[in-house]
C-alpha cells in the first residue's frame, strides 16, 4: 500500500465517518463499480480497491491500525509502508507509533474527550518525546512514563468537566483533589 492511497477517499467518506456511513458509501460504490454492472476495464480495479477499503474500515481494530498508519505516513517521510502496515496482523504497525496512538485512542474513547481535550493531551504527550524515550530507555520504560503522565493528567480532565457542569460540586472536588496532589 502506498502512502498516497487513502481508504477513506476511496470510499468517499470522512475519516470521522461512522460504520453506518462507511457501509452506505460502500454499498453505493459496489453497485456502481461491480464488474457485472460496469463494463469499463478500470472498474474491476476500482471495485477491488473499494472491497479492500471496506474490509479495513469496517473492522474497528483494522481501522485503528490503519489510522495509525495514516498518521505515521503523514508525519514520517521515511516510513516504510511495506514493513509497517499489514491489516491482517493487528500489531505489525510501526510499534513505536502504534503503542503511542493505541494508548491515546484508548484514552480518548474511554473518557469521551472532545477535540479540544484531545489536542491538549496530544500537546502534553508529544510523540517526539515518546520516540526519543524509546530510543534512549526502551519501549517498556517509555510506555511506563507515558502511562504515568496520563494517570497524573486524567484527574485534571475529570475536575475540569465536573467544575464546568456544576460549580458547587466542582469546588468540592477541587478542594479534595488539592489534598491528594
Curated annotation (Swiss-Prot):
InterPro entries: Apopto_cytoskel_mod, DnaJ_domain, DnaJ_domain_CS, J_dom_sf. This is Putative J domain-containing protein R266. It comes from Acanthamoeba polyphaga mimivirus. The keyword Chaperone applies. SMART domains: DnaJ. Residues 6-70 form the J domain. PROSITE patterns: DNAJ_1 (PS00636), DNAJ_2 (PS50076). It comes from the Viruses. Keywords: Chaperone. SUPFAM superfamilies: Chaperone J-domain.
